[in-house]
């Protein structure tokens, strides 16, 4: 039978899909449209050495991780920390459990990740995420639509599994926990799926409530088994700062969103008013901390150390050339700002009182 030969760039001879090395040993060449460049080199090395490469698996896991938008997770993690800290400082502190804390954090963050994935899917389906989109997961075909759907389903199932364990360990009534948890889960889906709150200018309201009062109340109740509505007052600084993340994102994407036919608060009020609103959301929490610091404890002045960074971010918001950096930088600020607030709540001799009734 006739054979075909081809001289490879390295000077080796290829016959019928086999490569002859300088030592005279023949190995199968890596072929296929997607096995090129570095991937082909890794695959060929694996065949020669007998050790399969793990780089492909690692890169896939990294891709899935990036699809979760980990930079945004401070919006759900910090309220959970705050609610847990308030539980530790409350009259029901003897109920505090580290196992409950970790399960609460896992449950809340997992649902947040699932909501991010759902957001990625529906933004792409509706033609909102295009070539200039910040989220490249589906735009650049990093993951397929089926993979994104599967990832979202797995995350929701994992969150529900965490909730079941939490319900077993928590002293709270099952119906109270379920009401808040499944309300939050539904909101994370309906933000872009189904009703699509994001697309009818209600996304800001959902985020303001969900990643503030609701998350703090859920974490507090999971630990203590009690409803304390004063915890919602403590959530106000975090809720405002978290809304600043979303508003900066929507302001940056306003032109693209308008072309896609959706309506956000940033589109309704325009660029100038959006800048004013962003500044209010960014700096109002610092005013609250200043008041708390003077009236209750100097510990509440601790988050003010992040104020210079807030001014830098606000300056970038006003510049079209640096506007694209603002959402992630605001999220980073939210994390450090929130952690310092939690530390203040843990260390302060006296906590603020909001005059609300406890149950």
From Swiss-Prot:
GO terms for molecular function: prenyltransferase activity. The keyword Lipoprotein does not apply. Its main location: mitochondrion. Pfam families: UbiA. Residues 1-23 are annotated as: Disordered. Its EC number is 2.5.1.-. Residues 1-16 have a biased composition (Polar residues). Pathway: Quinol/quinone metabolism; menaquinone biosynthesis. The keyword Transmembrane applies. Keywords: Membrane, Menaquinone biosynthesis, Mitochondrion, Prenyltransferase, Transferase, Transmembrane, Transmembrane helix. Prenyltransferase that mediates the formation of menaquinone-4 (MK-4), a vitamin K2 isoform, thereby acting as a mitochondrial electron carrier. Mediates the conversion of phylloquinone (PK) into MK-4, probably by cleaving the side chain of phylloquinone (PK) to release 2-methyl-1,4-naphthoquinone (menadione; K3) and then prenylating it with geranylgeranyl pyrophosphate (GGPP) to form MK-4. MK-4 acts as a membrane electron carrier downstream of a electron transport chain complex, improving mitochondrial oxygen consumption. This is UbiA prenyltransferase domain-containing protein 1 homolog. It comes from Drosophila melanogaster.
């Amino acid at each position: 039978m006739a054979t075909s030969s081809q001289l490879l760039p390295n000077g080796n001879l290829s016959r019928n899909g086999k490569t002859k090395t300088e030592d005279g040993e023949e190995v199968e060449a890596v072929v296929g449209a997607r096995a090129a460049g570095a991937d082909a080199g890794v695959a060929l090395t694996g065949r020669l050495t007998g050790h399969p490469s793990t780089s492909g698996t690692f890169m896939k896991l990294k891709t899935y991780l990036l699809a979760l938008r980990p930079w945004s997770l401070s919006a759900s993690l910090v309220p959970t920390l705050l609610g847990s800290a308030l539980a530790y400082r409350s009259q029901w502190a003897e109920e505090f459990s580290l196992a409950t804390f970790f399960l609460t954090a896992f449950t809340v963050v997992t649902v947040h990740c699932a909501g991010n994935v759902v957001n990625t899917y529906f933004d792409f389906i509706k033609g909102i995420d295009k070539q200039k989109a910040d989220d490249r997961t589906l735009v650049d075909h990093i993951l397929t639509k089926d993979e994104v759907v599967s990832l979202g389903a797995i995350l929701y199932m994992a969150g529900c599994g965490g909730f079941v364990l939490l319900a077993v360990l928590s002293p709270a009534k099952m119906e109270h926990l379920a009401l808040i948890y499944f309300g939050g889960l539904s909101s994370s889906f309906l933000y872009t799926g189904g009703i699509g709150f994001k697309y009818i200018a209600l996304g800001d309201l959902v985020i303001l409530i969900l990643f503030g009062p609701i998350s703090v109340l859920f974490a507090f109740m999971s630990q203590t088994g009690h409803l304390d509505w004063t915890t919602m007052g403590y959530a106000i600084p975090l809720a405002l700062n978290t809304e600043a993340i979303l508003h900066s994102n929507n302001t940056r994407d306003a032109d693209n969103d308008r072309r896609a036919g959706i309506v956000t608060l940033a589109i309704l009020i325009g660029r100038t008013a959006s800048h004013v609103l962003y500044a209010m959301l960014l700096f109002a929490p610092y005013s609250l901390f200043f008041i708390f610091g003077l009236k209750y404890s100097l510990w509440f002045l601790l988050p003010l150390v992040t104020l210079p960074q807030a001014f830098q971010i606000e300056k970038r918001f006003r510049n079209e050339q640096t506007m694209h950096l603002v959402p992630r930088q605001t999220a980073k600020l939210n994390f450090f700002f929130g952690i310092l607030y939690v530390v203040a709540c843990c260390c302060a001799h006296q906590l603020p009182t909001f005059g609300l009734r406890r149950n």
